[in-house]
Amino acid sequence: MIKTGIIGAGRIAKTMAATLREMDSVSCYAVAARDYDRAEAFAKKYGFCKAYGSYEELVQDEEVQLVYIATPHSHHYEHIKLCLNHGKHVLCEKSFTINEGQAAEVLAMAKEKGLLLTEAIWTRYMPMRKTLDDVIASGIIGKPHMLTANLGYLISGKERIMRPELAGGALLDVGIYPLNFAAMVFGSDVKEITGTAVLTELGVDAQNSMTLVYPDGKMAVLNSSSVGLSDRRGVIYGDKGYIEVENINNCEGIRVYDVNRNLTASYETPKQISGYEYEVEACVRAIGNGELECPEMPHEETLKMMRWMDELRRQWGMVFPMEE
């Protein structure tokens, strides 16, 4: 059983803790927050053995094997390095870092130290991903030519979205999901990536649209928003029909339609704890096999997603303070 630690005690950490508590392959061992009382309350609520008032104390605990990083993505780079320097395997929330340079550095560092480091982009690990792959491969919609995907939440008032010093904006927080959806369906070998964004007064993107063009002529048309609520749908268009994915952020079902727009097949999502369990199980498997990356989200894919977002931000003139 892998002893897990969590860095950060916010909303996403609570979801992970509630998930870990229901799993047999890991144990809820330690949690750290910048405030000890908060960490202690978290530990009591979710059944963790240890609570720490600093991240440094948690990584110094030799019992901790795998650390889940649930801090704002502006801090992922330093927290990944902190964990790796203390010999911990790492599952880090998305966005993995703020740019490709940071990602490349910590991934190289993990390989050098012989430690697992992987990005917690949960959609990559879910079983419905294989279901979607199988449906497309069956040829039921013929040759796919285009996909659309969107993700929008009413989150513009949240600190992590508003503030440039926290690497805020819609792109890194929610735009990463449509981008990953496109990469999972059509691959990550793109010929061209372009985008348009509306920036806030503080200089981060409130909402955006992104277009990927592939060497074989396929296109992915994507958008994300922190100010508008979207239907979260992904649609893949073929020459014999189309596929609708209900909620690209946590698949709630897949529906297949023919050329007359008649429903021909549907697939339900299997019962899950929260959906977070799949990325944790992937880490447990990788650690058990002595692997340094998870096949569900290889390092090269994490680097490509960061590269895409770097290019989009370059087009928008969106630079974070820590990059200047």
State each model region's role.
Residues 1-46:
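N-terminal Rossmann-like dinucleotide-binding module
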Residues 16, 49-108:
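Beta-loop-alpha module in the N-terminal Rossmann-like domain of NAD(P)-dependent dehydrogenases
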Residues 180-253, 270, 282-289, 323:
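Contiguous beta-strand/loop segments that form the cofactor/metal-binding neighborhood of enzyme cores
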Residues 104-122, 143-147:
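Rossmann-fold dehydrogenase core element
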Residues 123-193, 201:
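Predominantly a Rossmann-like dinucleotide-binding segment in NAD(P)-dependent oxidoreductases
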Residues 52, 92, 117-119, 148, ...:
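Hydrophobic residues in well-ordered beta-strands that form the structural core
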